[in-house]
């Protein structure tokens, strides 16, 4: 873990309630794809966010939900915005977590995210493509409404870079014009795979979702030691 000051270079809206934040560290930092950072609002208030960028990039990208009802995220976003306006840096701790991508495995991969947990699998998916990993990779991204699929086109393009890559967006409450999968994202995985025994599975999303996913996937053959999510340490 590295503690470092970062300039807040960009805050832009991806949707009405989700923002992309770009931080530039004052010095080089190292982390593994799938790890997270903590934004230090104070010495006693540190808030974790998945790193959406890849380790070979010089900037740190975050995807932060800013809904007023979500004070945990909105307060962090307000701090970032304040520092950006004042042209002052923020303090972050980088390289935390144990759910990083296991590049030395030869198993096929399932990346599963709910909501802004997508930033976690976004980093891993791009790392996989950059390294030309030639294994089947299935990316499932679940959202409540289709307008929350803020990187849908980006991921469709990612899937076209390799015939073994697949991107499956899943919308919980779709409009009548939605053509894709519907319902709960973990159920889409269960419907698509008779057995999950052979897969490395990476999961990001709310703690409640992570618990449901772990239990359901193990029942369908997944090995707990081949399932990765930082939430698993707390549930």
Where are these regions (language model features)?
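Reductase modules of NAD(P)H-dependent flavoproteins
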Residues: 2, 140-235
């Amino acid at each position: 873990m590295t503690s470092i000051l970062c300039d807040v270079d960009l805050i832009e809206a991806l949707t009405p309630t989700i923002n992309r934040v770009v931080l530039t560290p004052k010095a080089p930092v190292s982390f593994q794809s799938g790890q997270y950072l903590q934004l230090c609002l104070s010495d006693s208030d540190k808030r974790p966010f998945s790193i959406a960028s890849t380790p070979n990039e010089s900037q740190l990208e975050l995807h932060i939900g800013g809904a007023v009802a979500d004070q945990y995220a909105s307060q962090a976003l307000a701090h970032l915005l304040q520092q950006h306006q004042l042209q002052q840096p923020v303090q972050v701790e980088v390289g935390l977590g144990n759910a990083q991508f296991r590049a030395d495995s030869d198993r096929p991969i399932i990346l599963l995210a709910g909501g802004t947990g997508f930033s976690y699998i976004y980093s891993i998916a791009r790392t996989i493509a950059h390294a030309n990993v030639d294994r089947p990779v299935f990316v499932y991204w679940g959202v409540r409404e289709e307008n929350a699929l803020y990187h849908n086109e980006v991921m469709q393009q990612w899937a076209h870079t390799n015939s073994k890559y697949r991107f499956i967006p899943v919308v919980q409450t779709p409009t009548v014009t939605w053509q894709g999968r519907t319902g709960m994202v973990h159920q889409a995985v269960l419907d698509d795979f008779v057995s999950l025994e052979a897969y490395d599975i990476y999961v990001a999303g709310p703690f409640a979702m992570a618990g449901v996913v772990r239990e359901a996937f193990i029942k369908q053959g997944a090995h707990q030691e081949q399932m990765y999510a930082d939430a698993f340490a707390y549930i």
